[in-house]
C-alpha cells in the first residue's frame, strides 16, 4: 500500500520570518507572469535588507519591487524587465546604474546550470 504524502504548508508570515538579512533568496515566475507577490509584500513588510535575489530566469515586477523597497543588494538573473509595460524595470535600472545593487547578468542556461550545481 502506498503512503500518501502529507501536505506541508506554512503561513506566508512564518515562512518569511525564516529569512534573515543578507541571505540568498530564490523567486520564481517569469517576467510579470505568476510572481509570488504575497511573499514579496511580506519581505517588504518585514523590512529585510541586503538580500541576494536569484530570480527568473527573466525577473520582473517582484524583483523590481524588492529593489525599490531597498531589500536587495545583488540580483542574479538573465534580465529584469516589465516587457511592453516599461521595458527594463525602472527600480532595477536606477539602482544598477547608480551602483546601489550589484548584478550578475547571466543567460538562462548559465542561470539554470548554476542553480543545479548549487543543489
Locate the predicted segments by residue:
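Conserved alpha/beta enzyme-core scaffold
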Residues: 2-119
Amino acid at each position: 500500500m502506498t503512503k500518501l504524502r502529507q501536505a506541508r504548508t506554512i503561513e506566508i508570515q512564518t515562512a518569511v520570518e525564516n529569512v534573515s538579512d543578507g541571505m540568498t533568496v530564490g523567486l520564481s515566475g517569469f517576467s510579470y507572469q505568476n510572481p509570488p507577490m504575497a511573499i514579496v509584500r511580506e519581505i517588504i513588510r518585514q523590512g529585510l535588507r541586503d538580500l541576494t535575489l536569484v530570480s527568473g530566469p527573466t525577473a520582473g515586477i517582484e524583483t523590481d519591487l524588492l529593489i525599490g523597497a531597498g531589500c536587495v543588494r545583488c540580483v542574479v538573473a538573465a534580465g529584469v524587465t516589465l516587457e511592453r509595460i516599461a521595458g527594463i524595470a525602472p527600480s532595477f535600472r536606477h539602482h544598477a546604474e547608480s551602483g546601489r545593487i550589484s548584478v550578475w547578468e547571466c543567460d538562462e542556461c548559465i542561470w539554470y546550470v548554476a542553480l543545479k550545481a548549487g543543489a
